[in-house]
């Protein structure tokens, strides 16, 4: 890489080149699903954090609701089991299994919350939507690029210079 430097005099030379964004990002969802909404069009300028697209989260919401219900039920049951354990009316082994079950359910609950959040695609940077690769109602897999985002605040210019020009003092 050679950095441009000023030269003495009024010398002007022209060379063919390509101007491109220094950063181009292919954005996709962290979960699979059917696209419910595209909130941008090609060429749109978007800000960091802005919503780009949303998947249908119906099934994920149902899974979350079921896990929340199980967690509430087991939490209530744990209150009773703690009292029974304190009075030595259940074995340590049974109590420890119940505690472990509640912890596993807590992890599953957090995972389900994350999955619901992953149905929304937000921009990690400000930039322009260069391309949209899917349409509303299409199915996408985890990690599949839905849009291409470019940051035009930093650009690169690629050009080939003849050796005779490059070697001049």
Labelled PLM ranges:
Residues 24, 37, 86-87, 118:
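Short basic coil micro-motifs at the edges of alpha-helical modules that engage polyanionic partners
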Residues 38-39, 44-74:
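Structured, soluble extracytoplasmic/luminal domains of envelope-associated proteins
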Residues 59-114, 132-135, 157:
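Alpha-helical coiled-coil segments
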Residues 5, 28, 56, 122, ...:
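Residue-level detector of conserved, well-ordered beta-strand and adjacent loop positions
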Residues 18, 32, 36-39, 45-51, ...:
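Surface-exposed patches in structured soluble domains
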């Amino acid at each position: 890489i050679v950095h441009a430097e000023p030269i003495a005099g009024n010398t002007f030379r022209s060379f063919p080149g390509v101007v491109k964004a220094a950063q181009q990002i292919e954005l996709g969802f962290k979960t699979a699903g059917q696209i419910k909404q595209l909130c941008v069009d090609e060429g749109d300028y978007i800000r960091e954090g802005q919503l780009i697209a949303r998947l249908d989260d119906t099934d994920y919401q149902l899974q979350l609701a079921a896990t929340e219900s199980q967690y509430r039920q087991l939490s209530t049951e744990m209150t009773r089991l703690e009292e029974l354990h304190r009075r030595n009316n259940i074995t340590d082994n049974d109590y420890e299994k119940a505690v472990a079950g509640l912890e596993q359910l807590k992890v599953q609950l957090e995972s389900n919350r994350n999955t619901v959040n992953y149905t929304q695609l937000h921009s990690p940077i400000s930039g322009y939507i260069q391309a949209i690769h899917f349409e509303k109602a299409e199915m996408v897999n985890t990690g599949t690029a839905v849009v291409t985002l470019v940051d035009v605040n930093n650009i690169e210019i690629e050009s080939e210079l003849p050796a005779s020009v490059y070697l001049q003092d």
